[in-house]
């Protein structure tokens, strides 16, 4: 009887070891795949920036466009700003929206566009980041608010870890977290969690207050999982950006966002890191240029 028990225990331990080892191998493969994706994204970003700087210099030398008023700093994480510059062929008077603008500079997609002469609407819910953004971006309208679906008004609560130590706590302080997750992040990284209330509105309501005079060229949506709600609040049947750059950590699996954009005749052209670039499918020339850049121009790889 004792021998049988030893055999059973040995079999169970062997099975547990096999399952654990298989999970470890799967995790290693996923981490290796993520590392390759990050390396590919960094390489694409480098190619895009080299292409854009060379193109900008050539245009300025030939007189096609005037020299830039100041050196242009491309700050985005995956070269999104450089691609937008190329996509709009160095346009100097565009209009953008950035929902989730953070401090206005860190990994900003629209900072370079404002440096070129664009203006826009920047929205940031966290009070400290809003103040930094307002100071850093004098050429645009900066609004302190959280964004929701159409008809949103009043205030909403945020659970905010006040960063004590570590980048994760600081990052968590910039985004909207559930109370449980906020407490977990705060506790894990030495931060105290507090609840704050911030103004709640929609993008369409903000645009109604100061409508863009010549349409919306670009809308950047980086709202940590609330993309579908914020897009609903933009009211795409009224305010229709030519290009949408939308963070999607599900990499296309979020049917709510995807279906809403397809229903409004947008086509996803390329992935830049975890950001999908969507172009108005009714704008034939812009869509064709975006596909050209994705297929063999400034960017190689990452097509939808």
What are these regions (language model features)?
Residues 9-13:
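Alpha-helical transmembrane segments of integral membrane proteins
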Residues 2-6, 19-304:
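Phosphate/nucleotide-binding beta-alpha loop and adjacent structural elements of enzyme active sites
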